[in-house]
């Protein structure tokens, strides 16, 4: 079997699902089940025991075979992200933390310096750190060196649906990385998830593309199939590209005539 290894955890599914933007919790749960995802990310602010209508921890923790990965979305500094991570671990019991630090709400680009600092400290504290980062090969390597379990470069801006706009940089990150590379943000279509897996990504994280689809459970299942197909294609090894045509048939003879 071909498993995804993150720290001491082993997953058979390489599709990670986000939990934001769903119209209701029941639809979210249905989509998670349809996706076959085993790792699900949820914002700390959705851990709300007092306001049941806003709480996602209860419904998610009731699912069998699901590991929660809290995220620090909303943090604008390393200090805020570290504080959020401590609360999230206490509430969820999960060692995973997705470090998200994007101080500008206009573009939601991750702050590389603050992300590195928070990730360094949290990794020392024993968290399985999964940092959301710009598609920067140098930063990705630095995060690997401080003990992150994976790196999560953005395909394109959060919620933009622009797909793998950073494909070239992501390929460089994959080439140099000794930990799983997980494309996070910007994916719109299952074909883009397949393309990310064909490049050699360890997994993809999808949220908006499923949550705002016309039929979220069906779209979740489509992404699951695409991720599996892309991974199989990567393992089978794609044919090399060529700048000129290469005939699939011998050109030495045609109808008994030698060329």
From Swiss-Prot:
Belongs to the ThiG family. The active site is at 98 (schiff-base intermediate with dxp). It comes from Chlorobium phaeobacteroides (strain DSM 266 / SMG 266 / 2430). It comes from the Bacteria. Pathway: Cofactor biosynthesis; thiamine diphosphate biosynthesis. Homotetramer. Forms heterodimers with either ThiH or ThiS. Disulfide bonds: none annotated. It is an enzyme of class 2 (transferase). Its EC number is 2.8.1.10. Pfam families: ThiG (PF05690). One of its GO terms (cellular component) is cytoplasm. SUPFAM superfamilies: ThiG-like. This is Thiazole synthase. Gene3D superfamilies: Aldolase class I (3.20.20.70). HAMAP family: ThiG. 1-deoxy-D-xylulose 5-phosphate binds at residues 159, 185-186, 207-208. It is found in: Cytoplasm. GO terms for molecular function: thiazole synthase activity. The gene is thiG. Catalyzes the rearrangement of 1-deoxy-D-xylulose 5-phosphate (DXP) to produce the thiazole phosphate moiety of thiamine. Sulfur is provided by the thiocarboxylate moiety of the carrier protein ThiS. In vitro, sulfur can be provided by H(2)S. It catalyses: [ThiS sulfur-carrier protein]-C-terminal-Gly-aminoethanethioate + 2-iminoacetate + 1-deoxy-D-xylulose 5-phosphate = [ThiS sulfur-carrier protein]-C-terminal Gly-Gly + 2-[(2R,5Z)-2-carboxy-4-methylthiazol-5(2H)-ylidene]ethyl phosphate + 2 H2O + H(+).
């Amino acid at each position: 079997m071909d498993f995804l290894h993150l720290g001491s955890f082993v997953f058979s599914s390489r599709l990670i699902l986000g939990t934001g933007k769903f119209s209701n919790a029941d639809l979210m749960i249905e989509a998670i089940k349809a996706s076959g995802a085993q790792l699900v990310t949820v914002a700390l602010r959705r851990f709300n025991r007092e306001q049941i209508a806003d709480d996602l921890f209860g419904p998610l923790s009731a699912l069998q075979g699901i590991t929660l990965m809290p995220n620090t979305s909303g943090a604008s500094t390393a200090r805020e992200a570290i504080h959020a991570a401590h609360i999230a671990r206490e509430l969820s019991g999960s060692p995973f933390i997705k470090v998200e630090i994007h101080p500008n709400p206009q573009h939601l680009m991750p702050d590389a310096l603050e992300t590195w600092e928070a990730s360094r400290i949290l990794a020392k504290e024993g968290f399985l750190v999964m940092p959301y980062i710009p598609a920067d090969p140098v930063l990705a390597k630095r995060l690997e060196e401080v003990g992150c379990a994976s790196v999560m470069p953005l395909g394109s801006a959060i919620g933009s649906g622009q797909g793998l706009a950073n494909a070239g940089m992501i390929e460089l990150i994959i080439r140099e990385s000794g930990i799983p590379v997980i494309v996070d943000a910007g994916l719109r279509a299952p074909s883009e998830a397949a393309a990310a897996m064909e490049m050699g990504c360890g997994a993809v994280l999808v949220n908006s593309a499923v949550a705002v689809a016309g039929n979220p459970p069906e779209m979740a299942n489509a992404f699951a199939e695409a991720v599996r197909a892309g991974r199989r294609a990567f393992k089978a090894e794609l044919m090399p590209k060529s700048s000129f045509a290469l005939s699939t048939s011998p050109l030495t003879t045609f109808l008994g005539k030698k060329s």
